[in-house]
Amino acid sequence: MTEHTTGAPPRLAGELVADPASVELTASIAGHVARVANAPLTGADTEAARKLLLDNFIVSLWGATRPWTREIAQWTRRFAGTGASPVLGTDWLADPSIAALVHGTAAHSYELDDTHDEILSHPGAAIIPAALAVAAATDAPQADLLRALAAGYEAMALLGASAGGMETVHRGFHPTSVFGSFGAATACICLHARQRGEAVTRDLLIAAWGHALSQACGAMQFSAEPGGGEVKRVHAGYGARNGVLAAEFAHLPAVT
């Protein structure tokens, strides 16, 4: 047995080592997204965000009628009164993470949600529910919500593309859930920053993305089921919920 008395602790066999190139790429993307988040939207961007919001709203109302969404919505009754975010399809309010879970599930229920072809994802199904839930809890104005959405879409697209898009599927993971967590976390970070009257920073985004990565989920097993698996619908809800939590945990200094 080797005795270590000084210096850094010994590395475990097979322990991952941070790739400098990946660290640099993450910092570069975070810096870009921070600039997007802190800049006012152009007229064209504002109109695009409004259309995405309207599209998500209509699709989600339809999706809220599906049995899986209704069951999860009713399951959230135990969380009624835990927050100020409306839970879609119910008459109660709950913590933003719970509201985002239900809304995200509804948004992805009919495969009519928006699609980013390169990263094989449905950004709005994860980003918009998370942003709306946090916006409700923080009483954010529409302008702040739209800016948060723009930053969330930018982050999800860039991070998803850098991760390889289809490669994620080949490894057995559902991109909407995995990448959606990052986009949702970004949008929520923006809303929290605006509420505090602060700028979105690169380091804060990186912290939130670290928590999003730690929660990454969504297996492609549903695609192997003979009749398909409706758990796929919940994957967007997971992405939305994880993003809300990632943004909150990014502000906890001891949780890094």
Give residue ranges: language-model regions.
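N-terminal core-entry segment
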Residues: 3-256
